[in-house]
């Protein structure tokens, strides 16, 4: 074997060993850190409430920009607006409900992500979603059915007592 070929073989083996060793070293976990919590209150527009409670002159375009849960202690918890939270923007009936939200609270953020919506009513607790009678599909916001493009209805499913 020629000297150059031997060096290439040695360097190739060294590179393989280095790559294998790097693969074995535990890397930093890139998954976001969050805690699952249950919070209760009414969903409101943050700008409107801040204007009413503090007198801050909120600009008109920001009045209904951010959704928040207002607790019974008047604490305002901003909602990350994904499909679940957008339901509160699209359907004002939801903003009139006392709700219990199962949320993810991410580290280093005051905002939460909604995982589950439960209405707390005088006649019990009800999981809230939308239902298409034609396709038997549940959806999380008011819109046309994703399948048949027909109308969907607000559905309240009784949650068993704990």
Predicted regions and their residues:
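Short, charged beta-turn/beta-strand-edge "cap" motif at the junction between a beta-strand
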Residues: 104-110
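N-terminal secretory signal peptides that target proteins for export/translocation
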Residues: 1-10
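Structural detector for short beta-strands of small beta-barrel domains
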Residues: 32-63
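Cys/His-clustered metal-coordination modules, chiefly Zn-binding fingers
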Residues: 115-162
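Bacterial N-terminal signal peptides
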Residues: 12-23
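Short nucleic-acid-contacting surface segments enriched for D/E, G, S/T with interspersed K/R
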Residues: 83-100
């Amino acid at each position: 074997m020629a000297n150059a070929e031997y060096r290439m073989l040695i360097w190739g083996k060294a590179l393989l060993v280095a790559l294998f060793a790097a693969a074995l070293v535990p890397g930093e976990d890139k998954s976001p850190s969050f805690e699952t919590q249950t919070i209760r209150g009414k969903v409101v527009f943050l700008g409107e409430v801040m204007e009413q409670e503090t007198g801050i002159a909120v600009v008109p375009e920001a009045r209904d920009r951010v959704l928040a849960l207002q607790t019974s202690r008047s604490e305002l918890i901003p909602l990350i607006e994904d499909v679940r939270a957008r339901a509160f923007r699209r359907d004002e009936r939801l903003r009139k409900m006392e709700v219990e939200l199962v949320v993810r609270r991410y580290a280093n953020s005051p905002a939460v992500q909604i995982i589950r919506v439960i209405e707390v009513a005088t006649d019990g607790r009800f999981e809230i979603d939308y239902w298409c009678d034609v396709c038997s599909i549940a959806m999380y916001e008011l819109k046309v059915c994703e399948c048949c493009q027909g109308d969907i209805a607000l559905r309240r499913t009784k949650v068993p007592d704990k």
